[in-house]
C-alpha cells in the first residue's frame, strides 16, 4: 500500500445527466468531467464514479435507462485524466443510499446477491466484467448497510471479488498498480452495530474502508448539531451507544469500557470504534468528509443556532415547495433547501444575505447562522480540514474520502486544501492546537494501552486487582482468590497489551 495518503473523491452523475451529457451547458450537467482539471487530477488518488446498481439478475449493472454509448463516453473522459496522474485510479461505486438502503429500490437485489455461493460468484464475476469492459481500476461497494443476517454472505462476496481482482491484476500485468476493492462504511454506531462483530473479516479483503463520517446530524433529529464534528462539545447532544448490542460476546465490564453511553456522535468516535477492534489496520481506515452542508430552519439564536430545536421537515424527498435557505439557487433547482454544496455556501456567505460564519472550537467545525430568518447550516471548509488532516496523520489512517467532487467551488479549493495539508513540503501543522473537544474514551482489544506486568504463574491464587501478563496481554482480576488462567473465565479483564 502506498505511503501517500489516499484522497478519494466521488464523481456523482445521475442517469439523466449521463444520457444528455454535455460539457458546455451546466444547466444540463452541472459538473462535467472537464471541470476536473489536470491540477485536480494530480491531487486525487481515486475517483469513485457513482452509482451503478445490482439488477434483478443479481449482477452489477447500470441503471437500465442508461445510454451505453454516453456512459462509455463519460467514463472514457474520466480515465483520460490518468494521463495527468498515472497513479490515479478510476473506481466505480455500486449502490448508494437510493438503491441500497433498507427501503431502497434495489435493496432485495443486494440481499439476494450475497445469499448463496452461486449468487455470490455471479455477482463477483459481473463486477470484474464491468470493471474490465469500461476500463475501471477497481470496485467500490456502497451498500447502506447489510443487516446482521446478511453479513456472512457480504464477507464471502467481498472475499470472492478480492480473489478475482488479484487474479485479474496478475493477468493484466498490473502489479505496480493493482485493481482495488473498497467499501463505504457506516460513520455512526447505529448502522455500524449491524456488522461490528465481524468488522475485521469485512476489512480483511479490502484496500480501504471509507467511513461516511458525515450526516451525523440532520433534520431527522430533534435538535440541530454539527454533521461532521471532529470532537464532541459538552453543550451538544449525546446518544445511546448501539455498539453495546453488537453481539460481541463480551462481558458487561468490557462492553461498558469500550462503549461509553451516552456519547458524542463524532468523527473521532467512529474512527476509534474501528481502531479498537483487533484486525482493523489504521492504514485501511479512510475518513469521510462532506463537501456540502446541512441546513435547518426555525432555530433559536441563543447559541448561533447550535443545539436548538428546529422545524425542518425530515421526510425524503423534501415534501414542500418552500425553499427557505436564503440565497441558495441550487436548493430551488434540486427542490430541497436542506442540502447545499460548499460552492453554494461560499456564494451565500459572500453575498449580502445576512449569514454569519461562526466557529466551534470544540468540534473544530464552522457553521452558518442567519439570525433574522432563524437558519443554521453545518458544514466543513478548509479550516476544519486542517484539524481533520492532522488527526488522520496522528492516527496513521489511510487518508480521506469526500462526497462529492461537484460540490467544491470552481477552483477546487477544498480539494487543494486537502492536498496541501497532506503533501506540501512547506506545510507544518506541528503547532496546530487540536483543542479540548470531547474525545471518545472507549477502549477495546485493538487499542488497549501498552503495559507491563509480571507473568502469570499457574497454580497461584491472585487477589482482587492483581495484574499479570499472559499470551501477549495484561490481565486484571475482578475479584479475589482467583486460581484460573486469564481469559478462561469471567474472573479476568484484559486491560493492556505487551509491547
Swiss-Prot record:
Q: Which InterPro entries match?
A: CBM5/12, CBM_sf_5/12, Chitinase_II/V-like_cat, Chitinase_insertion_sf, Glyco_hydro18_cat, Glyco_hydro_18_chit_AS, Glycoside_hydrolase_SF, Glycosyl_Hydrlase_18
Spell out the CDD domains in the cross-references: CBD_like, GH18_chitinase
Question: What are the entry keywords?
Answer: Carbohydrate metabolism, Chitin degradation, Glycosidase, Hydrolase, Polysaccharide degradation, Signal
This protein's GO cellular component annotations are:
extracellular region
Q: Which reaction does it catalyse?
A: Random endo-hydrolysis of N-acetyl-beta-D-glucosaminide (1->4)-beta-linkages in chitin and chitodextrins
GO term, biological process aspect, one: polysaccharide catabolic process
Chain ranges of the GH18 domain: 42-425
Q: Record-annotated residues binding chitin? A: 68-69, 95-98, 145, 212-215, 403
Active-site residues are 144 (proton donor)
| Protein name (record) | Chitinase B
What is the native source organism of this protein? Serratia marcescens
State the encoding gene. chiB
